[in-house]
């Protein structure tokens, strides 16, 4: 008689159905570390993909990291491509129609907005934001508002490595 298998079979990690389930369900409930905080200086944006979702991280001059879907709400065009890395910018400008957003996600300008019928209101077109926090040396993002609290998710990390957690990643050496 064969011993019961105690681990998932290898094909579970390569099965496209499992990947879809992970991306569309299970992993949506948790925070994900996307980058080191030091990789996103103030006045920069960074395009990344998380669970097949194109994201754009920004850090305005106030130092707060923010996460948005990397697509203009007007026509869905990406603001920035991943291959560009962290990019210094004061605004996000859609390459399609030139809609211009602040790094906080506020619509600052839209082409020919006076000619819209019904009347156009900028405050109705913010960038869709996602939960985003900096904890320790990392920037964490969740893809839904219904997410496990970050403090709960990182409780064990905070207990075990609290002294290292506040250090920049380039100064941490794990043995």
Question: What is each stretch, according to the model?
Answer:
Residues 1-64, 101-175:
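Rieske [2Fe-2S] iron-sulfur-binding subdomain
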Residues 47-95:
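Glycine-rich active-site/cofactor-binding loop and its immediate structural neighborhood
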Residues 94-97, 132:
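Hydrophobic alpha-helical packing residues
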Residues 71, 98, 145:
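A short beta-strand motif that forms part of the nucleic acid-binding face
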Residues 76, 100-101:
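FAD-binding glycine-rich core of flavoenzymes that anchor FAD
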């Amino acid at each position: 008689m064969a011993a019961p298998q105690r681990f998932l079979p290898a094909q579970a990690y390569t099965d496209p159905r499992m990947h879809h389930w992970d991306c569309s369900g299970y992993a949506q409930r948790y925070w994900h570390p996307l980058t080191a905080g030091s990789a996103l200086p103030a006045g920069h944006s960074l395009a990344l993909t998380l669970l097949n979702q194109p994201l754009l991280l920004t850090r305005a001059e106030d130092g707060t990291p923010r996460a948005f879907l990397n697509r203009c709400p007007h026509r869905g065009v990406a603001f920035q491509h991943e291959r560009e890395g962290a990019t210094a910018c004061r605004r996000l400008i859609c390459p399609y129609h030139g809609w211009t957003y602040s790094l906080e996600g506020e619509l600052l300008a839209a082409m020919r907005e006076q000619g819209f019928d019904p009347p156009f209101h900028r405050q109705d077109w913010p960038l869709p934001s996602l939960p985003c926090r900096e904890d320790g040396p990392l920037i964490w993002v969740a893809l839904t508002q219904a997410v496990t609290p970050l403090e709960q998710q990182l409780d064990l990390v905070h207990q075990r490595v609290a002294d290292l957690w506040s250090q920049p990643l380039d100064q941490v050496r794990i043995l």
